[in-house]
Regions:
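A conserved structural motif in NAD(P)-dependent oxidoreductases
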Residues: 238-243, 253-265
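Substrate-binding pocket helix/loop in short-chain dehydrogenase/reductase
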Residues: 122-135, 249
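Catalytic loop of short-chain dehydrogenase/reductase
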Residues: 119-123, 160-206, 217-220, 226
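Short C-terminal tail/terminal secondary-structure segment
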Residues: 8, 256, 269-270, 281-301
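Short, small/polar-rich loop/turn modules that mediate ligand/substrate recognition or access, typified
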Residues: 205, 210, 280-282
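Alpha-helical segment proximal to the catalytic Tyr-Lys
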Residues: 151, 202-203, 278
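Canonical Rossmann dinucleotide-binding motif of NAD(H)/NADP(H)-dependent dehydrogenases/reductases
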Residues: 16-54
């Protein structure tokens, strides 16, 4: 005991930071979603993992497959936790709600909501449907997951929305990237999701339910390493490769890195999900290697 506080060393065997909790993660089959599910499981949470596991026509790069979701479940179970998986489209409120209900029936509770599913149809020349698809997944999908989870949440629950550094840019063209209608839809969706977190967090606060957003920069996932993203960063080339595009990736960060790892985002998710963040709500946490600092001048605290 030191100044009235018990030292960590005196508390006995360490427990995971989310031991005994249950988390639902959308877009859990691969990339950031898999990383979030695995890290939460490593810290003691059981996982309800949902994913579309199919492609979307205007999104040029391939999305996850059922076997990817199975692998996420295997990794969760390898951490000693239970996994409930279901193929579900975040754009379909009824189907998503039913999937969550089944997961909660299996595990008995729901404490953590991670709205991670997203697409980035960042290809110039696509039809207007690309804007609609980006908004339907990246904004409506967030609302559907959160609203379908509400009836299961009690005081102490934590909702985390995975946004994007694009939420703090005036448009996708801030960095010289022409993303077409899909890129514009992506930026709009992320801006709107950030505003949603701010306003809904205030409404949830009196129920002791917390809500925060995490805004990554480039993340080392399949979304970044895709043909449309390479073309966005190297519009001077017809068919740029990773080797062509990667030297340009650092343009959106202040720190000299091309991207961050999925685990860097998962660490923020884990913190916000844990009781260590019990009084943190309504925040826009940027894990962006200083990207925000490059596009937004200081305007006071």
């Amino acid at each position: 005991v030191w100044f009235g506080f018990t030292s960590f060393a005196a508390k006995g065997p360490a427990m995971g930071r989310v031991t005994g909790k249950v988390a639902v993660v959308s877009g859990a089959a691969r990339g950031q979603g898999r990383s979030h599910a695995r890290m939460l499981a490593a810290e003691g949470a059981d996982i309800i993992a949902v994913d579309l596991c199919a492609d979307i026509e205007t999104n040029e790069y391939p999305l996850a497959r059922p076997e990817d979701l199975d692998e996420t479940a295997r990794l969760v179970e390898k951490e000693g936790q239970r996994a409930f998986t279901e193929i579900a489209d975040v754009r379909d409120r009824a189907a998503l709600s039913a999937a969550i209900d089944r997961g909660v029936a299996e595990f008995g509770r729901l404490d953590i909501v991670v709205a991670n599913a997203g697409i980035c149809p960042l290809t110039a020349g696509l039809p207007p449907q690309a804007f609609a698809d980006a908004v339907d997944v990246d904004l409506v999908g967030v609302l559907n997951l959160v609203h379908s989870s509400l009836k299961h949440l009690q005081a102490g629950a934590s909702i985390i929305v995975i946004g994007s550094n694009a939420a703090f840019m005036s448009s996708m063209n801030t960095t010289g990237i022409d993303g077409g209608p899909g890129g514009a839809g992506y930026a709009f969706a992320k801006i709107a999701a950030a505003h949603y977190v701010n306003d809904f967090a205030l409404a949830l606060a009196k129920f002791s339910i917390r809500m925060n957003a995490v805004h990554p920069t480039n993340v080392n996932t399949d979304m970044l390493h895709s043909a449309p993203m390479y073309r966005a960063f190297r519009p001077d080339l017809k068919n740029p490769t990773r080797e062509d595009a990667e030297p340009v990736f650092p343009v959106v960060q202040a720190m000299p890195v091309p991207y961050v790892e999925p685990e860097d985002i998962s660490e923020a998710v884990l913190f916000l999900a844990s009781d260590a963040a019990r009084y943190i709500t309504g925040q826009q946490l940027r894990v962006d290697a200083g990207g925000f600092l490059k596009v937004k001048p200081w305007s006071g605290a």
